[in-house]
UniProtKB/Swiss-Prot annotation:
Gene3D superfamilies: 2.70.40.10
Source organism of this protein record: Nitrosococcus oceani (strain ATCC 19707 / BCRC 17464 / JCM 30415 / NCIMB 11848 / C-107)
Top-rank taxon, per record: Bacteria
Stated name of the protein: dCTP deaminase
Keywords: Hydrolase, Nucleotide metabolism, Nucleotide-binding
UniProt key word Zinc: no
Paired cysteines (S-S): none
Listed NCBIfam families: dCTP_deam
CDD domains, per the entry: trimeric_dUTPase
Coiled-coil blocks: none
A GO molecular function held by the record: dCTP deaminase activity
Protein's gene: dcd
Alphabetical list of Pfam families matching this protein: DCD
Amino acid sequence: MSIKSDKWIRYMAQAHGIIEPFEPRQIREANNARIISYGTSSYGYDIRCSNEFKIFTNINSAVVDPKNFDASSFVDVQSDVCIIPPNSFALARTVEYFRIPRSVLTICLGKSTYARCGIIVNITPLEPEWEGHVTLEFSNTTPLPAKVYANEGVAQVVFFESDELCETSYRDRSGKYQGQTGVTLPKA
């Protein structure tokens, strides 16, 4: 299994639509202002979060249960900035829609800009033949409110290609998050 370069990422995005919309280079500025970078990097792709957020709140004194998650535990927000309460979290989705080839597995890692502020981005691997918008989880580990910026870089996707095809892909086993298009809550 080998890590894939910027050349491979550009080719696969442009010829096979594995990332849409796709930015073939790193973008570090918008409207004459510095932003948290996104786009193609040397050995990965820096993804953006959309302006759709679900901010966790415990107004109902709920117990967090991944098998029976209470959707009313979230407040829906559409904004260019998400303010996450202290020691809480928010969900969002990527701007980019992914179509992962059968021979590829991706690992997603949070950007250091957020990590150095106590904001942790958690994303599970994108499995072979999975497709959809990626649901992002932002944990604010600080005792203060924390900002996440929409349409700017939040994490990096690193692509690994296997030397042989898997027997069963995410699509083959009808994965429960296949084709997701919005911020998707846990499914048991």
